[in-house]
């Protein structure tokens, strides 16, 4: 999705340099200087500027339809939030949320806004290509997003808010009979009007998130273009909300037939929250509300020592101690020297290193803005200053400007731009830190300080508007970066009470490298194991010389945490069959249809996992089988029917070689070890394997059959391991249930260093269609919710489920290692994708529970899209060549597991489409191994029996 930003003029020229965002994805411009276009005219101007910059030979209609776009209006003067007026409110730095993982110390309002908008636009039907939003709000939702109707020309999101809040905003009115269709839009209606509506109407409060079809965009542009074509005529002022919005609906308040003809859907953002960052007060109140959204101590990942929760410090050098009397303090990109005194309602931004003696009374704020190469604008202001109105009538520094001027001996009439405080030239420009402190003292609290009066009098002075227009934003950001780099070692050192290890450690490691910061001191062994593992992976990312050893340490600690409980309980295998009996274990394989990867440690240990999968037989049989039988000699014989290999084990050392590269029997060796046939896993002690087997009563012959090619994506290795463990459990009387077998499979995979999650083994150990869920923590015991199997077994549906072996193989280990690495690092984008996948599994659960075949099929397609976002190699060209042949015939398809090859699972639109898919792929086989395999739902899961 392309992002089109309307920004303050001074920010446009350096936006990409200071944000490091790619210019080909982020386009920015400003409204014409000195012209007020309104939100509608501004939208037209922004679209026209973007079209001129990138259209090539496309017509405007072609360009508009060629991509999805986010239009973000952030070009205001920021009168009521002076601290971030120069860089634009949209780039306001916001602290890491104390309850959130994967955020960055350098995050901004913009970086927090965009992910939700991306999610919404990913759901938008074809033709709804343009989203228009405001730049000074943060919106989040705790519930699934509602589906977007395909019939709408305009989709508007709203919240259910009370009349005391709604009266200050636009509201969408609908009838109770058609609650998603707009009747009319009202701007700032009275409480009485809203009360009268509720008897037979609903109303939603506008949150400024609109999606427009190409048709609606052109209607909006035509109304803000006075003559000629919408890409060429003069742009005029037009309000998208007060004029365009009020002309929408079945009974609009403004008559305009062309606008009223547009079909409008209004959608409640269920579980939505709306936080405004438009004023100094809102900067603190909104952030405090966000930080306090979660008070459950189990959800809060660090425990700070602030004396009050409304104290926010970022990118700063603080040399004072906070006290209980401090409230509503915002310090960012600033140095607070040891001789400063702060009280409450203070915002301090941009202040360079200093040793001033300075007191800020309640409500006094300071903003220092770099000008040119070596000067600064000194801007004190009041917490509630609105910067609007003539100097004779306006408030400044918490009092009237007139009284401030009188106290400081300044004649209002002598001030240039006195018609409006925003235009008044009252802020002095200085070229050294000492003068900066002196003139601040004079302006804030020492009107009799002659030196300060003299400096103010002789200085060049700027207005608030001029400061924004002339600010050197590169210097401003450079100072911020310097302070942040200075903070990092302290934040790391104070890790138990800071956000360090809940941050995006990939981002943090980059900051350590870029600023050549020494790594933190080694973490104590008493620290939580998972934190130590994340610390090791952070060090691997931050350093080049020891990257591999730190990575190995991280995986080793993960392995220790996952295996500790199982290894703490040793086993005492005892022969539980007759001398001529054979134990036969057999298992289906699994197809993950939603939520795969969320079961993978360490993600599932941090946040839990949700997976919907199905257990299937191939060609009518469980494809994974293990036979265990006694043998007279005191040794262990391992055989593989499909590989035609065998190995005889006579010593503990030979059995302990389950990690030997290239061994076809790594899985059964590790399974035998976990069953108690290695000393470290056995309750009793024996000098040799031979002596243990003699005491056991016989040797063992273990025969494996995997009737599936390697790299199938069907969970083969995990389920083969659980099949072997299940058969040994019965043969040796170990007393494990399916949950124990699943856990020990996870341990086995850790012993083999292949890693992996829990959904593979539980997907086949347990029958049918099910949702598997775990909570955070090392005890990953899935809760199982079985689903109706009608969509898989009823004849007309069953024929639509197709399984095709592509003949392309790809092992999952290297894919897994890189994705797991990013899990350790709390990498923001991947974490967001995993959370989306986790919710997606619940959507799939709902679709199957409702027996909605079409929705289920489409959701499988969404699963495939998610997998590709997580790992681009999931869908190589060879696979794309296959799917391109049948794309239009499927509701959805995916490669099970890690992808890249193996089997292709398809859900055809209907039986006729299924027949056509079979014909097409049989006629266009990509290789001599490619073939259809008959799949059927397994209703029994893992089975074990005796001869």
Report residues per predicted region.
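N-terminal glycine-rich phosphate-binding loop and ensuing alpha1 helix
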Residues: 1-129, 133, 138-146, 404
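Left-handed beta-helix
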Residues: 2-7, 28, 35-36, 42-58, ...
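Short helix/loop capping segments that flank catalytic or ligand/cofactor-binding pockets
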Residues: 14, 80-82, 141-142, 165-167, ...
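Stable alpha-helical structural segments in soluble proteins, enriched in small hydrophobic residues
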Residues: 46, 553-561, 671, 719-731
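Conserved core of the sugar-phosphate nucleotidyltransferase
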Residues: 65-66, 85-88, 92-229, 268
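Short beta-strand segments
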Residues: 71-74, 132-134, 157-160, 213, ...
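DPxDG-like acidic metal-binding loop motif
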Residues: 87, 91, 712-734, 905
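C-terminal nucleotide
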Residues: 445-694, 743-753, 761-895, 905-947
